[in-house]
Structures are given as C-alpha cells and as structure tokens.
Regions:
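Hydrophobic alpha-helical core bundles mediating ligand binding, dimerization, or RNAP-core interactions
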Residues: 17, 21, 25-28, 32, ...
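Acidic/histidine-rich alpha-helical segments that form the ligand environment
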Residues: 87-128, 142-147
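Short, contiguous alpha-helical
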Residues: 2-4, 14, 18-22, 29, ...
Length: 171
C-alpha cells in the first residue's frame, strides 16, 4: 500500500515570511524562559551569555527597520556598540533580562507589522540608505531572509549555551 501525501494549502508569501520570522523569535524567547538576571549573564568559554544574544538580535532587527522602514532606532548608540558586534564585555552591567526581552519583543513587533504589509513586488525594493558593511542588506527581500536566518542561527547557539549551563533544550 502506498501512502498518499496531500499538498498543503497555498500560503501567501507574506504569511510565509511572518511564520519564519515569528518562529525564530518564539524559539529565542522559549530558550530564554528559565533564565534569571544572574544566569542570563553567565557563559562558559567559548559561549556568549544570553543577554548578548538578546541584545545582538535586537540590534540586527532594529538596523533592518532603520534601513527598510526608515524608522528611528529603538536602541541607543551605546547599546548598539555593546551588543551589535562580537566583543567580549563585562556582562554583569547593562539592562536587566526583563528589559532586554521587552526590547527584543518591541523591535520584533515593529518589524512584524511592516512585514505583514509587504507585497511580493515590495521584495525587490532597495533601501534608500547605504547598509553598513553588507551590501546584501540593501535589497528588502534579501535583507528579510538574512534577518530570519540570523535569528535562527543564533537560536542554535543559545541552545548550545543552555547545554553548557546544564539546562535542557526544550525542542
């Protein structure tokens, strides 16, 4: 007997992008659930702490918004300098875990609203601003794909951090 696989109902491109964008975001939040302020700042070598991941992902999504939505940044220059790159810092200082999660959610919500209004023809648009360091971010469709992959990539690293800290990975 041969099994028949039915095709899924067609999905709009916008729904596809929103699903992918929300999936990685939700996974990061799920991985952060059982951290507290102290454990969110711990990271055995060679890992980065959870607060860095949250700040880094916030910076990248915020940067996308400034490039393609023309919005003002939701993060300060100091915040961006601290979390956008890979430098090691004194992670014992900085916003609380709750503040970091709230900012990550706010940046996601702002971009989600923008993505929900996109049409397929919008994906070919170019940012009027010059991207810093990565020309692939100039095109809206490419930048959107990169930001989704970026969150998913770091989600895997947060999973590795959890294992290094003796925590269970929930998925």
């Amino acid at each position: 007997m041969t099994a028949t696989i039915e095709a899924a109902p067609p999905q709009s491109l916008t729904d596809h992008f929103l699903h992918s964008f929300d999936l990685a975001h939700g996974m990061v939040l799920q991985l952060a659930e059982d951290f507290d302020d102290a454990s969110a700042r711990l990271a055995p070598a060679p890992h980065k702490p959870l607060v860095w991941f949250l700040g880094h992902l916030t910076c990248s999504t915020d940067y996308f918004s400034t490039l393609h939505q023309g919005t003002e940044s939701l993060v300060t220059e100091e915040f961006s300098r601290r979390y956008a790159g890979n430098d090691n810092q004194d992670w014992s200082i900085g916003p609380s875990l709750e503040e970091m999660i709230d900012l990550y959610k706010a940046v996601h919500a702002r971009m989600r609203e923008f993505v929900a209004g996109l049409t397929p023809s919008d994906l070919d648009k170019e940012s009027p601003l010059e991207p810093f360091g990565d020309d692939r971010l100039k095109n809206l469709g490419k930048a959107l794909a990169i930001i989704q992959m970026h969150d998913a990539y770091h989600c895997g690293q947060v999973g590795c951090l959890r294992v290094a800290l003796g925590k269970h990975v929930p998925f």
